[in-house]
Amino acid sequence: MSGNSSTDMYLFKKSLKELKGKKGKGTELISVYVPAGRRLSDISQYLRQELSQSSNIKSKTTMKNVQSAIEVILQRLKLLKEPLEMGVIIFAGMIPRGGPGTEKMEVYVLEPPEPVKTFVYRCDSLFYTDPLEDFIQDTEVYGVILVDRNEATIGTVKGKTITVLKKLTSGVPGKFKAGGQSARRLERLIDDAAHQFMVRIGEYATESFMPILEEKKLKGLLLGGPGNTKNEFAEKDYLHHELKKKIIDTFDLCYTEEFGIRELLDKASDLLRDLDLMKEKNLIQKFFKELIKDDGGLSAYGEAQVMKYLEMGAIDTLIVTEDIGITRVTVKCNNCDYAQEVNVKTNEMFKFEEQLKTKACPTCGGAMYIDEEKDIIEHLSDLCHMHNTDIIVVSTDTEEGSQISRAFKGMAAILRYKL
């Protein structure tokens, strides 16, 4: 993939969702995964062998469709330039649009976000998309341990997702008023109970984090909690020695459980600037700081305003939410050179197509037709590239991303200069 990573990942996820929804009439949809660095001539030779063997398929319709799909893939391979640093993934096949006879050849060429490792050729009624699921998973994981004398929470932060893996309670009694030997005996019992609680936390942490560490996906551990318990846990040998090496820092917190994890992430933001969650949070907070200024500062929001300023080259950073749901449509006249680009809500495309049938060209009165449909985020990404503007596609899983979606219809921006 090239260009902006958040845009590329959004488009990749969208393509994956579309591919998973495709279904062939029979076992005639072809999926080909070409590994990084693999010679395309080798792949073409393999496909020509499959093309030859497909003549043995009993159903003439299925045979014809399989052969057509293989030939389309062979044609696409000729257009690619070597070496392919990431490899390439190609899907092709006849997809029914309705009843019998409505099948249409569809082909998808994807550049994966990570190198393809294994060659795959598969012919099935569905496109083989399982390996694509692995590509969209965030690989870096932070482990989180929140601890005080009474309770502990073990969790992970992966990309934008916070997962609580285990909640523990200690049963350690609180302070008491007593004297003499009874007090000292009770104090020893409390200390022993606290020690055993720390041991339990360490065991669960090892169980939770060592598999991630062995997969080389554990970027670090963050420890937090009220009081000194967290420091004692970090300094003594409660954690596996390999996990102790991964401790990034400890943080004073008011809370434990999931709210405590969010509090910890706020306090650890300087250390986690590369984490997607922090990138989005900091950028959106910067937008809101501009927005609340008396004159609106360097903020812009809403489809009309943002599109206008973007085409002027006045936007420094564009923020778009994943759920924006808009398609950029190019409408043309079939009689003259008239053309128009409009934004249409994706879930209203059918309605738009029906209305277009009744509209005439404003120039010559000819019939209008849809020439191109493009995801608005892909269109915005192209404009941003033209004007040297940064674009970030944010999730609505976070509070900040959800605010952009609800309050500003999924589109906001930070300007280069005041307009």
From Swiss-Prot:
Gene3D superfamilies reported in the protein's UniProt record: 1.20.5.170, 3.30.1330.30, eRF1 domain 1 (3.30.960.10), eRF1 domain 2 (3.30.420.60)
Main location as per UniProt: cytoplasm
Keyword annotations of the record: Cytoplasm, Protein biosynthesis
SMART domains per record: eRF1_1
Pfam family, one: eRF1_1
GO cellular-component term (any): cytoplasm
PANTHER family, sorted: PEPTIDE CHAIN RELEASE FACTOR SUBUNIT 1
Family: Belongs to the eukaryotic release factor 1 family.
Its job: Directs the termination of nascent peptide synthesis (translation) in response to the termination codons UAA, UAG and UGA.
Protein name: Peptide chain release factor subunit 1
Source species: Methanococcus maripaludis (strain C5 / ATCC BAA-1333)
